[in-house]
């Protein structure tokens, strides 16, 4: 391959705003690069061989700065306007963070000044909102429910993980330790200048309370989940009431399959929905001066879902753990919507709680629906809404559900029939939008409903990938048309009976890039100026930026953040300030505050003014060398991106052992212009020891459009390694220090799966595979994930076979010291059974392997000692079997 102008196609994606052009930092080709036939044969470089104790000290030294970096990460920002016209501050911004030596997440705030001195950089001070209080827990002290939710949310910190806030009253609500707490700041009570001592929400519940939420219609009331049922509590009167009675807290899980208000495993793990109940934002007034508060909730029946048992002495008092886990091709939970109406008097006391169910069964009203992906309420509380998916996840519906569609739960058949007959025929679900794709639908969080201005219309902004293959914003107006279906006439409704016609659909954004809508990204709508703010990849698939455009008259999309960095942003409710947490490959994250303004006659062209710093960059890390980003044109026609970590003391005339770090699965992008020195610091450690480290995003990874991501539809495991090998060979053609005879591969979860695939499919390329928590048999994995990408197992037998390494164990190499498996014994996501069944087939085929079990760990390694041991084992195994001179002797 010829190299233009004697330079390699290597880029750090560093761009300068001042020049107004895209500037790539390129790396000079190493001496001897090119295709010269007479270049001297390079000698292998062997990494130094350390003892286990020496490696342990080396890791401890590299982690000193790493711990400091992890402690400085404010997040979950919320702006509250100050109302004092003569005061020096315009807003107070709240956030969660860890400070100093304290490793516990807690609430902080900073004051935003009305004016700044533009000649100096203002650093906002972090002020603790909460006084110290006893709510700390070590990892091993979490309840089972908390452990599992933390796994689903990928939470690794202790302390406060989330908070709820009611703007009108200034009420904060949060869970800490085993308790639920509340405080007031802002609102009619003014703003505190001293840390507040949280108030414990007292309870009669014996077990952990989860998922607390403030009632937006009356912040004196909260709801929470206790033992798979919904409870409510009044913060003022301290009255507490259980409002659902579906779970019996039986010791035998098989006899107690129902839950209320709880998102089941697949919804949490595969759809990022962690709650199963939703307060109505408005209360209905009663003639006596009281009010009716409503909660929409889902009720699940998991009686047909398989129970998985995990037995381990490390569970201490729990000798066995049991989980409902729907394996692909088997039954999912049966789900329905229900509604609870809480009638309270003028003094706030509960008069009655009415449990209501749908007038007809869920499966009749919502034929073909398998998953409740999202739910909520319209702003006026007139309708609940839900985003629904079929089992194949190729058909999506957005439906409106009126509270009138629910009737009181009644056991007497005649009384129930009278209640059904009392519901007018005109009250039905309304399908206000639907879409279909032949790939799959990626669920996201973008759905903004405008206040209704016409009784027979509803307007909303939604994001869709189905129309163009890239997720973009659309403003849709649907006509709320009365259904043709007449319940009183008998018979069953057809799905089309509830479909509303689309009056208008406006394309807000377009192009071969995507609007971000998951993992914290959403949209902010300025209804007064008819603007929508969003995060997207318009300027580069490797960088996330904040943009604004008009949704009334779509046209120019204006970028608000600086190029050369990747940003994660949060806007104030008035859209006059935004906070960006940003970094790039060279610079650790900063958090800065910006003020937005624009001419009245040109609201889209915002002027961004730097206002203050919330977190300054820690500067370059000692002994850290950032990777270089590269790209190449794949034979598939796609541009693929990768990262290259060069050995720190690169010597000419040497070729170096190479480690391919891999994930390669959907919904993840490893290669981007973000700082990698915290989460992926081990890759720098490998480079410091003398390894080349390569990371490549193959087809199937995210932020590149549905066609790119959908390339492995029905054939997971069959295309990814081709892309990875092509990337390695491309790099070897550019750099002669890459030793393709000494390549190792390592990844976790899907990356562990592909590490096995690599050794099985291309043992000629990969000398060593280190596979963490791998899927080895797709029929053992869950419905929501596996069927989305692979289809139903009955309809794709060949794909399931070719994608399952356990079924092809005979293809693994017969030499020892080439395969290391790592797995947490308590893994509730990719069960340890995946590893054990692979081992059974490897033994049957007479194939060697090495195994490391982590008895206390689930899918993610959380115990610090386990994490240290894992990294030590990784370094030692690579040293002994890939990088050192002794490894070369083993091959001989």
From Swiss-Prot:
Subunit text: Homodimer. Forms a ternary complex with NLRP1, composed of a DPP8 homodimer, one full-length NLRP1 protein, and one cleaved C-terminus of NLRP1 (NACHT, LRR and PYD domains-containing protein 1, C-terminus). Forms a ternary complex with CARD8, composed of a DPP8 homodimer, one full-length NLRP1 protein, and one cleaved C-terminus of CARD8 (Caspase recruitment domain-containing protein 8, C-terminus). In the ternary complex, only one subunit of the DPP8 homodimer is bound to NLRP1 or CARD8.
InterPro entries linked: AB_hydrolase_fold, Dpp_8/9_N, Peptidase_S9_cat, Peptidase_S9B_N, Serine_Prot_S9B/DPPIV
Organism of origin: Mus musculus (Mouse)
Keyword Transcription (UniProt): no
The protein, known as: Dipeptidyl peptidase 8
Reactions it catalyzes: Release of an N-terminal dipeptide, Xaa-Yaa-|-Zaa-, from a polypeptide, preferentially when Yaa is Pro, provided Zaa is neither Pro nor hydroxyproline
This protein's record includes keyword Cytoplasm: yes
Compartment(s) where it occurs, according to its Swiss-Prot or TrEMBL record: Cytoplasm
Encoding gene (name): Dpp8
SUPFAM superfamilies per record: alpha/beta-Hydrolases, DPP6 N-terminal domain-like
One cellular component term from this protein's GO annotations in UniProt: cytosol
Gene Ontology biological-process entries: negative regulation of programmed cell death; proteolysis
Alphabetized UniProt keyword annotations: Aminopeptidase, Cytoplasm, Hydrolase, Protease, Serine protease
Catalytic residues identified in the record: 749 (charge relay system), 827 (charge relay system), 859 (charge relay system)
Function according to Swiss-Prot or TrEMBL: Dipeptidyl peptidase that cleaves off N-terminal dipeptides from proteins having a Pro or Ala residue at position 2. Acts as a key inhibitor of caspase-1-dependent monocyte and macrophage pyroptosis in resting cells by preventing activation of NLRP1 and CARD8. Sequesters the cleaved C-terminal part of NLRP1 and CARD8, which respectively constitute the active part of the NLRP1 and CARD8 inflammasomes, in a ternary complex, thereby preventing their oligomerization and activation.
Family: Belongs to the peptidase S9B family. DPPIV subfamily.
An example Gene Ontology molecular-function term: aminopeptidase activity
EC number: 3.4.14.5
Regulation: Inhibited by zinc. Inhibited by the serine proteinase inhibitor 4-(2-aminoethyl)benzenesulphonyl fluoride (AEBSF), and by di-isopropylfluorophosphate. Specifically inhibited by isoindoline derivatives. Inhibited by Val-boroPro (Talabostat, PT-100), a non-selective inhibitor, which triggers pyroptosis in monocytes and macrophages.
């Amino acid at each position: 391959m010829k190299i233009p102008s004697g330079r390699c196609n290597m880029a750090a994606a560093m761009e300068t705003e001042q020049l107004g052009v895209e500037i790539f930092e390129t790396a000079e080709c190493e001496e001897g690069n090119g295709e010269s036939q007479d270049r001297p044969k390079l000698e292998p470089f062997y990494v130094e061989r350390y003892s286990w104790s020496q490696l342990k000290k080396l890791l401890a030294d590299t982690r000193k700065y790493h711990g400091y970096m992890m402690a400085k990460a404010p997040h979950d920002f919320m702006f509250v306007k100050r109302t004092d016209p003569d005061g020096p501050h315009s807003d107070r911004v709240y956030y969660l963070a860890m400070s100093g030596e304290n490793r516990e997440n807690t609430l902080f705030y900073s004051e935003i000044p009305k004016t700044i001195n533009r000649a100096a950089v203002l650093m906002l001070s972090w002020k603790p909102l909460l006084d110290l209080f006893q709510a700390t827990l070590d990892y091993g002290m979490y309840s089972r429910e908390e452990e599992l939710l933390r796994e689903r949310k990928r939470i690794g910190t202790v302390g406060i993980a989330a908070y709820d806030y009611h703007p009108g009253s200034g009420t904060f609500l949060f869970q800490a330790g085993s308790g639920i707490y509340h405080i007031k700041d802002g609102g009619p009570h003014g703003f505190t200048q001293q840390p507040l001592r949280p108030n414990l929400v007292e309870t009669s519940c014996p077990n952990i309370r989860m998922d607390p939420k403030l009632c937006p219609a009356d912040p004196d009331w909260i709801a929470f989940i206790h033992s798979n049922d919904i409870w409510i509590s009044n913060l003022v009167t301290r009255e507490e009431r259980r409002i659902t009675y579906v779970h019996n807290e039986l010791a035998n899980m098989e006899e107690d399959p129902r839950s209320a208000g709880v998102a089941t495993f697949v919804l949490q793990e595969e759809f990022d929905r962690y709650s199963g109940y939703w307060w109505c934002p408005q209360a209905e007034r009663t003639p006596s001066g009281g009010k009716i508060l409503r909660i929409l909730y889902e009720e699940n029946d998991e009686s047909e879902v398989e129970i998985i048992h995990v037995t381990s002495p490390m569970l201490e008092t729990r000798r066995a753990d049991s989980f409902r886990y729907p394996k692909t091709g088997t039954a999912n939970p049966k789900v329905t919507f229900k509604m609870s109406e809480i009638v309270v008097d003028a003094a706030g006391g509960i008069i009655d709680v009415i449990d209501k169910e749908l007038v007809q069964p869920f499966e009749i009203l919502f034929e073909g629906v398998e998953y409740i992906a999202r739910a909520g309420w319209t702003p006026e509380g007139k309708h609940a809404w839900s985003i629904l998916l079929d089992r194949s996840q190729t058909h999506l519906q957005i439906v409106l559900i009126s509270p009138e569609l629910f009737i009181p739960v009644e056991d007497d058949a005649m009384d129930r029939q009278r209640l059904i007959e009392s519901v007018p025929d005109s009250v039905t679900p309304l399908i206000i939008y639907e879409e279909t794709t032949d790939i799959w639908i990626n669920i996201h969080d973008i759905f903004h409903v405008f206040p209704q201005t016409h009784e027979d219309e509803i307007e909303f902004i939604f994001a869709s990938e189905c129309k163009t293959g890239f997720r973009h914003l659309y403003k849709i107006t649907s006509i709320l048309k009365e259904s043709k279906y007449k319940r009183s006439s008998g018979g069953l409704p057809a799905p089309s009976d509830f479909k509303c016609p689309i009056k208008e659909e406006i394309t807000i954004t377009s192009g071969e890039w995507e609007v971000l809508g998951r993992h914290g990204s959403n949209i902010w709508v300025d209804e007064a100026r008819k603007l929508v703010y969003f995060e997207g990849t318009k300027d580069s698939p490797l960088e996330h930026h904040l943009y604004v455009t008009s949704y009334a008259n779509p046209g120019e999309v204006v970028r608000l953040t600086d190029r050369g960095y990747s940003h994660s942003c949060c806007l104030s409710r008035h859209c006059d300030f935004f906070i960006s947490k940003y970094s790039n490959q060279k610079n650790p994250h900063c958090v800065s505050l910006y003020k937005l303004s624009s001419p009245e006659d040109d609201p889209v062209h915002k002027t961004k003014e730097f206002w203050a710093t919330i977190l300054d960059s820690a500067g370059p890390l000692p002994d850290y060398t950032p990777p270089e980003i590269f790209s190449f044109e794949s034979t598939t026609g796609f541009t693929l991106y990768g990262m290259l970590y060069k050995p720190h003391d690169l010597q000419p005339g040497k070729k170096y052992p190479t480690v391919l770090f891999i994930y390669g699965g959907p919904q993840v992008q490893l290669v981007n212009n973000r700082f990698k020195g915290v989460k992926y610091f081990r890759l720098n450690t490998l480079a410091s020891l003398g390894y080349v480290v390569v990371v490549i995003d193959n087809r199937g990874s995210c932020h590149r459009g549905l066609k790119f991501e959908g390339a492995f539809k029905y054939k997971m495991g069959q295309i990814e390694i081709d892309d990875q090998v092509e990337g390695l060979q491309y790099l070897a053609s550019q750099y002669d220090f890459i030793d393709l005879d000494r390549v190792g591969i390592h990844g976790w979860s899907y990356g562990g799966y592909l590490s096995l695939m690599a050794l099985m499919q291309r043992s000629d390329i990969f000398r060593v595979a280190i596979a963490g928590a791998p899927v080895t048999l797709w029929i053992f994995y869950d419905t929501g994930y596996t069927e989305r990408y692979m289809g139903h197992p009955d309809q794709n037998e060949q794909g399931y076979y070719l994608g399952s390494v356990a079924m092809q164990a005979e293809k693994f190499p017969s030499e020892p010291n080439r395969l290391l498996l790592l797995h947490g014994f308590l893994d509730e996501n990719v069960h340890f059974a995946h590893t054990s069944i692979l081992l059974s087939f490897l033994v049957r085929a007479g194939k060697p392997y090495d195994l490391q079990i982590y008895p206390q760990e689930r899918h993610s390694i959380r115990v610090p000692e386990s994490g240290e041991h894992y990294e030590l084992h990784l370094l030692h195994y690579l040293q002994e079997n890939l990088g050192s001179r002794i490894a070369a002797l083993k091959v001989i």
